[in-house]
């Protein structure tokens, strides 16, 4: 078979991706025979990069995937996980039917999982929800979902939970990974999400990675960074982390810093900029304002924890006070080169070189960060601090210059943040605490005034605590695996799930750790078994069509949400005051009120697409995905969140919002790029009425838990290239599982020697919360400094999150998975 140049490049890219993971691909797989295969586009199911792939189907199955050569994001490339996308749906243990714990023919908390019908499943769910609402009110009924559900599913969830069941206890697992970034974006700019785009990679002169192993977690973007670095010797890469990983292989300046000390480093950089007269005064005076944050704000622990009791400003953690440049200068002034070195352990010459990069007006610079930055008990502060240095120098909203928060899930932006599936949010950056925002939603959704509660519900970690304490009694977990992925499993998560007062539902395609701990498992369609839409890290919205059917009785998350709404009549969940405003809703179901409202149900299924599949539209009798999207899109149009029309996204490889007059926006807030910035304004941060971004003064504060005499090591957790999050999908791909079958604990050889341990030894990692048996690695891809160990959480056989501390950022509620105290002994 002859290969074109494009085919040859794609084939070699596949081999390179496999080699990075230690996988040898059979020669026949490099350019497989595609006769009889139908190809269509879809965004990748894994990280937030938003790669587009071509999905090959034959005889009702996905048989192959390949990088989409027409996609701007990945340009025909796949990482190793993307290469094996075709296998994620075909694990031998797919859940085929709803499974309810039963004993003697009825539900029993300690019963065995027994097949039931969808009607039986929804009936007992509705019974539990109605009883809980009657006894304790809306916030005792919760949903925990993710940035992996589609935009349509997220929007349907928000409507059912916040409007239908009148509960704001709905949160995504993005609370564990992106909440601090989102909160800091909103506080700094008045709007969420990055102002730049991936085009910055090819236009910048320098990259600084803060707590981000892009080589393994965002490998396609890393390939673009590598190409930029290797094509121009003037381009520099700085990689900053608490341990050495694969991204260090490209670093011109590799920096290892002590956990939590990024706060001190960033304040030093701000101080350096000021002391060396490198402030861009024209930009700062025109486009910024100064605020001061509260200090001593606690650690998001239970109120009775000594650290919480000792903190002075727990209740005002998020408060910002008007300030000035002079006050900001005083806040950062103590962070000298000497002090930053003392706190961080970073050599002075490296700190100074880093500060000079940010300060040099001729140096274009992009800052990238992910979980090492966000999963932090001062995550909001540290996000503010990175914005501070970009704002002080004016290196923002400009090609090749900007702060860029990367996401870890395919639609953490599109579904969790933009749609508003957080406890406090509504679509398009609106919030439940703002009466005007609530009024806008109630009017658009044709609801009685006062339907949507105005107080946030229980966020992720609080959901676990409230389940344990008996204040949250119904939880529906969808498209995530918190029993493995959440913090402090033994003490805070498992007790609540098995609390006999509570009823736990898990929608999942596989029997995950969460699923087997639940009371009811609902079999769920995956990826291209449904029509969907994702929003990636650069504000790019991407659509795909359903391409195959799900197995047996599997149903999409969208179908489950909307169908479940049929089990509630308005008067069963709304009070008489609401019913009196709209008596015509009496006797109607939430399905009729929320989804047969003349908006969601007004589009017919297309008849001009050969082989078109849409199981949800077939069941409901209308094009529900289009109806949901067009209703949702109205909230952002004209307000800086403009989305294109539905059909456009099916034709394109995604568009970056705001999309105005058919044109996407690459750089927000900048004249000439953003249609919301008028001629002559240069920059305008229009999330705030005055168009100014906030520079926030906050100090370094110590972490919630540090090593001591007994627990003498830092423990940090994260991921590896081959597996994604809790491994529910990737561990069912034989090639990925074989390449990295089990979790390891990485340790410095000197630390191992002190403990009488050697590479490969079976060890026990112990913290104040739990212990885990694993094997030691002192030679592998991750090289820890003395005093720190690193492990991953993909392995259901080890459950690393038995070890982690459930401390959170007090402002965002995001969990700090990156630092707690541990000890290691031979097992």
UniProtKB/Swiss-Prot annotation:
Write down the Pfam families for this protein, in alphabetical order: Molybdop_Fe4S4, Molybdopterin, Molydop_binding, TAT_signal
Traced from the root, the source organism's taxonomic lineage reads: Bacteria, Pseudomonadati, Pseudomonadota, Gammaproteobacteria, Pasteurellales
GO CC annotations, alphabetized: membrane; nitrate reductase complex; periplasmic space
Q: Which reaction does it catalyse?
A: 2 Fe(II)-[cytochrome] + nitrate + 2 H(+) = 2 Fe(III)-[cytochrome] + nitrite + H2O
What is the top EC class of this enzyme, as a single word? oxidoreductase
Q: Which domain of life is it from?
A: Bacteria
- Report the subcellular localization: Periplasm
Q: Give the record's keywords alphabetically.
A: 4Fe-4S, Electron transport, Iron, Iron-sulfur, Metal-binding, Molybdenum, Nitrate assimilation, Oxidoreductase, Periplasm, Signal, Transport
On assembly, the entry states: Component of the periplasmic nitrate reductase NapAB complex composed of NapA and NapB.
Q: How is the cofactor bound?
A: Binds 1 [4Fe-4S] cluster.
Annotated [4Fe-4S] cluster binding sites: 44, 47, 51, 79
So where does Mo-bis(molybdopterin guanine dinucleotide) get bound?
81, 148, 173, 177, 210-217, 241-245, 371, 375, 481, 507-508, 530, 557, 717-726, 801, 818
List, in alphabetical order, the Gene Ontology terms for molecular function in this entry: 4 iron, 4 sulfur cluster binding; electron transfer activity; iron ion binding; molybdenum ion binding; molybdopterin cofactor binding; nitrate reductase (cytochrome) activity
Q: What is its EC number?
A: 1.9.6.1
List the source organism. Haemophilus ducreyi (strain 35000HP / ATCC 700724)
| Post-translational modification, as annotated | Predicted to be exported by the Tat system. The position of the signal peptide cleavage has not been experimentally proven.
Q: Which PROSITE patterns match?
A: 4FE4S_MOW_BIS_MGD (PS51669), MOLYBDOPTERIN_PROK_1 (PS00551), TAT (PS51318)
- Name the UniProt record assigns to this protein: Periplasmic nitrate reductase
């Amino acid at each position: 078979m002859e290969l074109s140049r494009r085919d040859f490049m794609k084939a070699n890219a596949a081999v390179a991706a496999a080699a990075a993971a230690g996988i040898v691909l059979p020669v026949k797989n490099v350019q497989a025979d595609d006769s009889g295969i139908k190809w269509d586009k879809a965004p990748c199911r894994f990280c937030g990069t938003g790669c587009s792939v071509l999905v090959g189907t034959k005889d009702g199955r996905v048989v192959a995937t390949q990088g989409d050569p027409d996609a701007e994001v990945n340009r025909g490339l796949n990482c190793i996980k993307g290469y094996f996308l075709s296998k994620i749906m075909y694990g031998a243990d797919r859940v085929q039917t709803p499974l309810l714990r039963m004993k003697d023919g009825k539900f029993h908390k300690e019963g065995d999982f027994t097949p039931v019908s969808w009607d039986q499943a929804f009936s007992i769910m509705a019974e539990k929800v109605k009883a809980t609402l009657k006894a304790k009110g809306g916030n005792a009924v919760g949903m925990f979902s993710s940035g992996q559900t589609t935009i349509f599913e997220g929007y349907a969830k928000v409507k059912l939970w916040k409007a239908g069941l009148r509960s704001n206890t709905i949160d995504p697992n993005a609370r564990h990974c992106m909440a601090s970034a989102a909160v800091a974006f909103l506080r700094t700019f008045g709007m969420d999400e990055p102002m730049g785009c991936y085009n910055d990679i090819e236009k910048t002169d320098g990259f600084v990675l803060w707590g981000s192993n892009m080589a393994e977690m965002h490998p396609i973007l890393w390939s673009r960074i590598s190409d930029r670095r290797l094509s121009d010797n003037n381009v520099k890469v700085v990689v900053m982390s608490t341990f050495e990983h694969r991204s260090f292989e490209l670093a011109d300046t590799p920096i290892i810093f002590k956990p939590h000390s990024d706060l001190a480093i960033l304040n030093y950089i701000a101080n350096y900029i000021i002391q060396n007269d490198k402030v861009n005064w024209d930009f700062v005076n025109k486009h910024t304002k100064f605020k001061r944050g509260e200090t001593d704000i606690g650690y998001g622990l239970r109120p009775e924890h000594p650290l919480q009791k000792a903190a002075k400003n727990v209740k005002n953690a998020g408060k910002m006070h008007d300030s000035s440049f002079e006050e900001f200068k005083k806040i950062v002034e103590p962070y000298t080169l000497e002090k930053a070195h003392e706190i961080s352990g970073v050599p002075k010459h490296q700190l100074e070189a880093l500060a000079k990069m940010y300060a040099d007006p001729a140096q274009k610079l992009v800052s990238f960060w992910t979980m090492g930055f966000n999963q932090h008990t001062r995550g909001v502060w540290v996000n503010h601090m990175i914005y501070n240095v970009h704002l002080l120098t004016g290196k923002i909203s400009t090609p090749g210059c900007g702060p860029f928060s990367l996401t870890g899930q395919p639609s953490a932006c599109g579904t969790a943040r933009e749609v508003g599936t957080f406890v406090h949010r509504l679509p398009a950056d609106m919030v439940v605490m703002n009466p005007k925002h609530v009024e806008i939603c109630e009017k658009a959704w044709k609801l009685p005034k006062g339907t949507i509660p105005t107080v946030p519900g229980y966020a992720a970690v609080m959901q676990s605590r409230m389940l344990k304490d008996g204040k949250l009694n119904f939880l529906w977990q969808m498209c995530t695996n918190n029993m493995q992925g959440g913090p402090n499993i033994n003490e805070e998560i498992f007790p609540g799930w098995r609390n006999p007062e509570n009823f736990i539902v898990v929608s999942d395609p596989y029997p995950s750790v969460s699923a087997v701990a639940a009371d009811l498992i609902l079999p769920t369609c995956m990826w291209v078994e449904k029509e969907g839409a994702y929003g990636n890290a650069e504000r790019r919205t991407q659509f795909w069509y359903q391409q195959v059917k799900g197995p047996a009785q599997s149903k999409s998350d969208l179908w489950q949400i909307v169908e479940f709404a049929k089990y509630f009549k308005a008067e069963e969940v709304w009070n008489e005051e609401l019913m009196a405003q709209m008596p015509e809703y009496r006797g109607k179901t939430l399905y009729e009120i929320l989804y047969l409202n003349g908006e969601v149900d007004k589009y017919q299924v297309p008849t001009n697409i050969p082989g078109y599949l849409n199981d949800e539209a077939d069941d409901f009798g209308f094009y529900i995905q289009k109806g949901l999207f067009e209703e949702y899109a109205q909230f952002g149009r004209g307000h800086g969140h403009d989305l294109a029309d539905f059909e456009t996204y099916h034709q394109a490889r995604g568009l970056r919002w705001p999309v105005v007059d058919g044109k996407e926006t690459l750089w927000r807030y900048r004249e000439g790029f953003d249609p919301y910035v008028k001629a002559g304004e240069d920059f305008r941060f229009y999330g705030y009425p005055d168009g100014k971004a906030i520079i926030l003064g906050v100090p370094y504060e110590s972490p919630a838990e540090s090593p001591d005499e007994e627990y003498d090591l830092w423990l940090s957790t994260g991921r590896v290239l081959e597996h994604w999050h809790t491994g529910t999908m990737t561990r069912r791909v034989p090639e990925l599982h074989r390449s990295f079958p089990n979790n390891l604990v990485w340790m410095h050889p000197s630390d191992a020697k002190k403990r009488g341990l050697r590479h490969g030894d079976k060890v026990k990692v112990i913290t104040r919360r739990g212990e885990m048996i694993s094997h030691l690695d002192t030679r592998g891809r991750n090289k820890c400094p003395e005093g720190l160990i690193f492990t991953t959480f993909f392995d259901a056989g080890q459950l690393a999150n038995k070890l982690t501390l459930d401390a959170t950022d007090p402002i965002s509620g995001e969990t700090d998975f990156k630092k707690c105290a541990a000890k290691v002994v031979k097992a």
